[in-house]
Regions:
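Short, small-residue-biased leader/transition segments that mark boundaries at the very start
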Residues: 1-4
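Short, conserved micro-motifs enriched in small and acidic residues
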Residues: 6, 132-136, 192-196
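TPR repeat positional signature
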Residues: 6, 13, 139, 143-146, ...
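Catalytic cores of carbohydrate-active enzymes
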Residues: 10-92, 96-111, 115-117, 160, ...
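Long alpha-helical scaffolds in large eukaryotic adaptor/regulatory proteins
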Residues: 16, 20-23, 27, 146-149, ...
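C-terminal substrate/ligand-recognition segments
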Residues: 117-152, 203-207
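C-terminal hydrophobic structural anchor segments
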Residues: 146-171
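Terminal, non-catalytic domain-edge segments
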Residues: 196-214
Length: 214
């Protein structure tokens, strides 16, 4: 199973439990919370490894040890089966191996099969898409995760990260961001010249920052 799917399921259980509790159905809420407890414990046992990051995929004895950005959702979401120390370990490895000025790499340079350049024929570009190119929309969840861990002290870092994306607003499609970037310097913009999901995530982070700056 994919790590992000399991995290989405855990988050959904906790979210619905809170909703039904507010609606007055305490028994159902308690049942959902109990299921979430079991799910969360299993999540940590299955996906967290001795290096402090999360396996990207597990199916029986088959485990994907690649360092990929899907684990950042476990730190960014409202509900997580990880404790604060575990969340920080995940954030640290994402920062060290996946963070670029333009987004998060889809694969760490230290992992096998790394291909940061979205160039060449279609089949070659398709391979690079998930093997090392940087996706700006993932930066939104990364910055949200960073603020969850560091709170007010993380604001200046997040604001500096946004500068790297501001420069792109006049480089491709004015007022927008391209679909993706090469994972290595000079981080050239690639794909569609304007990608709504990227813009939406940056706007969401600006809104989140405004709450801290009140």
């Amino acid at each position: 199973s994919d790590v992000y799917k399991r995290q989405l399921w855990y988050n959904a259980l906790r979210f619905i439990a809170d909703l039904v509790r507010e609606g007055g159905n305490g028994l159902l809420a308690d049942s959902l919370d109990a299921q979430a407890e079991v799910t969360g414990k299993s999540f940590v046992e299955v996906f967290r490894n001795e290096y402090g990051y999360l396996l990207d995929y597990v199916d029986g004895n088959m485990m994907d040890w690649s360092v990929r950005p899907n684990m950042i959702f476990t730190v960014a979401f409202d509900y997580s089966p990880l404790d604060r120390v575990q969340k920080k370990q995940v954030l640290d490895i994402v920062t060290k191996e996946l963070l670029t000025p333009k987004g998060l790499r889809t694969l760490s340079p230290k992992s096998g099969g790394y291909n940061p350049n979205y160039v060449g024929p279609q089949i070659q570009r398709d391979y690079a898409y998930h093997q090392g190119t940087a996706w700006p929309w993932l930066m939104g969840f990364y910055m949200e995760a960073y603020l969850r861990i560091y709170k007010m002290s993380g604001i200046s870092f997040v604001e500096r990260q946004l500068i790297g994306l501001e420069d792109e607003m006049t480089s491709h499609c004015v007022g927008s961001l391209p679909e993706l970037f090469d994972g290595n310097p000079p981080f050239k913009g690639r794909g569609a010249v304007s990608f709504a999901m990227n813009v939406a995530e940056i706007l969401r982070i600006l809104k989140l920052l405004s709450k801290y700056n009140l």
